[in-house]
Amino acid sequence: QRQMCIRDRHELAPIFSTTNVATDHNQLTMETMKNVALRHGLVCLLHEKPFAGVNGSGKHDNWSITTDTGMNLLDPGETPNENIQFLLVLACVIKAVDTHADLLRRSASNVGNDLRLGASEAPPAIVSIFLGTQLEDVVRQLVETGEARSCLEGSTLHTGVSTVPDLPMDATDRNRTSPFAFTGNKFEFRMVGSSDSIGSPTTTINAIVAEAFCEAADRLEAAGEENFDMAVHDLIKEYMTAHQRILFNGDGYSKEWEKEAQRRGLPVFPGMIDSVEALTTDKAIRLY
C-alpha cells in the first residue's frame, strides 16, 4: 500500500512446490541472481535494507497444506461457513499462530530485517493474522452464536468507465500491512528477510500447525464416532474464541495497533536479539 509502486521494482516468484523442494528452489534462485548480476557488471544485493531512505526487500513465504491426493485443506470453497473441514483447519492455524507468535517472529529475524520490519514498506514486527472480511465475518458468527449461517459474497468494482467492464472483487480482499495474511487458498508469511532461507520460517509454521493438529486429533478421537460432529463443532468454536486476539484486519503500520497488540497480550519484539528468548520458553521446548 505505502511506497509499493516504485521505479524499477522487480519481483521473482518460483513456482509453488513442496516445502523441501521450494526451499532448495529459493536458495538456487538467490545464487543465480547473484551470479547473473556479476556477469552483467552488476551486484545483486540481498541485504534487507542496504541503503537508508530507499525501500529494502523481503520475501513472502506462501504456505498451504494438501493431502496426499492433492486436496488443498485451505481451500474455503464457495461457502466457507458450510465447509467444516476448512473451518477446523483454519481454527488450528489460528490457534498455532497465536500460541507461537513469538517463534514465528524469531524465524524471520535477522539484523538486516530489523531495519525493514515495521517500516511503511514491510509488514509490522508484530505477528497477527489477516483473514479478510468474508472469513472474519464467519469467525465472528461462530464466536458470537456458535454457528455461521451465512457468508459474505464478493462485490463488484464499478469502474465508471464505459470502455472498461465492471470487475468482480475477491471476497477475501487484501491487506498489505499484515504479516500473516490469508490470500484465497493459502497464507502468506510476509516477514521473511530477502537474504534468509525460507527453511526456518516454513519449518516453524509446519511444526506449530502440526502441534495444533495433534491436539485436535486427540480431542476428536477421544470423543468417539457418535459424538464426532458435535466435538468438531465445539472444537472450532473453542479455538476461534480462545485465539481470536491474533486476528487483525486493520492497519498494521499504525501506532494504535502497537498499543492494541500490547493490550491483547501479543508478543512485541523490537528486534532480533529480543526475539531469541522465544526459543527458551517451556512451550517452545515442548514443541521442538
Specify the residue positions occupied by each region the protein language model found.
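Short, small-residue-biased leader/transition segments that mark boundaries at the very start
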Residues: R2-I6
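Catalytic or ion-translocation cores adjacent to nucleophile or general acid/base/metal-coordination motifs
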Residues: Q1, H25-E48, G53-N55, S64-G112
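A generic structural motif
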Residues: F16-A22, T69-M71, E78-P80, G193-I198
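Generic structural "secondary-structure junction" signal
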Residues: P14, D75-P76, F182
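Acidic, glycine-enriched catalytic cores built around paired aspartates
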Residues: R7-H10, Q27, P50-F51, S57, ...
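Short, hydrophobic beta-strand segments
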Residues: H10-T19, W63, R190-G193
